[in-house]
Amino acid sequence: MVEGNKSVSILLFGISCVGKTTVGKLLANKLGWRFFDVDDGIVKRCGCPIGDFVNTYTCAERNDVRRSLILEYLYECIGNKVIAISSMHFKSSFEDIIAREDVIAIYLKDKPENIFNRLIFTDDNDQLMGDSEEYKQLHKAYYLREIREDIKFFDKVYCIIPNICDIDGRTAEAVAEKITERWVR
C-alpha cells in the first residue's frame, strides 16, 4: 500500500500476453505516474526486435539485460512509476528488487483461454501481422498448450511475488482499477 510522500514503483510480472503493458499504461495514466516497459527498453538498448533478442541471447543474458533495465528505471527515474516486466526465468534475477520497501510487485494471472484471446502476432520488425486471427484459430490447441506450460513454469518462478492479481477475463481498465483499490489507495 502506498503511504505518505515516498516514491513508489509498481512492477507488473506475468506471462506473455497477460496484459502487463496494457494494464501498466492504463494504471500509470490513471495515477499520473510514469510508465516503463522493459520490452521497449530492450528494443532500444539492443537495437533489435524482441524476437531477435529472444533468439540471439541466452536465457541468462536476457535476464541480465532485463534486470539492468529494471534497476535503471528504479534508480535513475525519479518519482512514482509503473514498470511492465517481461518474463524473467530466474528468481535470483529479481528477488532483491521485489524485496525493496519502495516496490509493489504484482503477478498478473489469467486463465489460458483469456490469454489466448489476447494473442497477437508480429513480424520480424515487431509490426502487427494482418489475418492472424485465422492462423490463431487453426493452431488454437497448440497455443493453449504453450500458454498452460508457461503458466505452470512461471507460477514456480513467480511464487516469491507477494501480490497476485487474478485478471479473470476482466478488461484492462477494470484490472487497473482493481490494482489501484487494492495496492495504491
Show which residues each predicted segment covers.
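NTP-dependent small-molecule kinase module
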Residues: 1-7, 26, 30, 104, ...
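Hydrophobic anchor at the beta1->P-loop junction of P-loop NTPases
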Residues: 12
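Glycine-rich phosphate-binding loop used to anchor ATP phosphates in small-molecule kinases
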Residues: 61-103, 108
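ATP-binding Walker
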Residues: 18
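A glycine- and Lys/Arg-enriched "phosphate-lid" helix/loop adjacent to the NTP-binding pocket
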Residues: 101-153
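P-loop (Walker A) phosphate-binding loop of NTP-binding proteins
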Residues: 15
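Walker A/P-loop
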Residues: 21
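Conserved substrate/cofactor phosphate-moiety recognition/catalytic segment
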Residues: 29-71
